[in-house]
Swiss-Prot record:
Binding site for pyridoxal 5'-phosphate: 96-97, 129, 214-217, 272
Class of this enzyme: transferase
Record's cofactor remark: Binds 1 pyridoxal phosphate per subunit.
HAMAP family, per database record: ArgD_aminotrans_3
Record's signal peptide: none
Protein's cellular compartments: Cytoplasm
Other facts: May also have succinyldiaminopimelate aminotransferase activity, thus carrying out the corresponding step in lysine biosynthesis.
Similarity section: Belongs to the class-III pyridoxal-phosphate-dependent aminotransferase family. ArgD subfamily.
Listed name of the protein: Acetylornithine aminotransferase
GO cellular component: cytoplasm
Top-level lineage group: Bacteria
Amino acid sequence: MIASVLPTYTRAPLAFVRGEGSWLWTADGSRYLDLGAGIAVNALGHAAPDLVATLTEQAGKLWHVSNLYRIPEQERLADMLVAKTFADTVFFTNSGTEACELAVKMVRKHFYDKGQPERTEILTFSGAFHGRSSAAIAAAGTEKMVKGFGPLLPGFVHLPWGDLDAVKAAVTETTAAILIEPIQGEGGIRPAPEGFLRALREICDETGTLLVFDEVQCGVARTGKLFAHEWAGVTPDVMMVAKGIGGGFPLGAVLATEDAASGMIAGTHGSTYGGNPLGCAIGAKMIEIVTAPGFLDEVSRKAGFLRQWLEGLVAAHPDIFEEVRGQGLMLGLRLKLPPGDVVKAAYAQNLLTVPAADNVLRLLPALTISEDDMAEAVRRLDAAAASLETQPA
């Protein structure tokens, strides 16, 4: 008999009833140190007091009214994002997948309205993850995600990760956009190669192609910048955002330049819940907090310590760990054994981590994690690795 919850996840036998900061509790009082943060969602930790206060205050005023009317909370958050990024305009969604759907529509409509309807192709990269909708799985093209789901949305060209020559060869008169994660998350915490994003920007400028960044996982202060592409010194035409922007509340967005968004006039897109007052009030508080003086510097400072300690783990357990990857507090440990084995060994140490492709263990702690909690997490990873080393082959 099928479970009442559709079994599309292989869930761990854990259920949590309370969270605070970087810690989660089960009903029996067991306490777990969380290095996953809901897969980079709980950016300020669990039950962050500022977000709880904002949610409580807004919940007592207004939750939902529909985009048929102006929504002051939505306008405030949009103004904040426009002021702090490349963007001229923002559309709010409830998730990263929804943001991907709009980004695809936006770039294609842009060229249709410019009198170039043949420009529909979008170049993407191996190892990508852009969500689970039909368009998003077509964009990524990963076999395990597309198998069995019938005809996919056409118009995506899949290229080897980081292969600039392949990009140059693939851009044609039918190319609309290049879509890339500045740091692949699900793909194994793989930052774009040095200079790659800048080279893509130059190709797009030369060919009139739009550059789309998926910052759903790597954005919103995760790397020590507000958005990860800032490290490369380039800007996109369109950007997808979600996860951390809501701090745990379902919220996403598409940011765009005026030119890139020029085709999206009234009636071309919509969302019943997207941009609701409750979500946008929380999003505005998130942006206020992570852009406050010193916050991003503190993320980078703590990330430096954590990376150094993880490098020590690699040296101490060469049969388990191969290398440290990533930037800021978006880190990964490439493993010499299946990630699931290490995840389970970490469970035994009451430590939560997240597996990824390319044999990688993701470490995505709350941006507010303390040094003591980071040190404790490394101690527990050390114990997990030691337990695996003592297991019979």
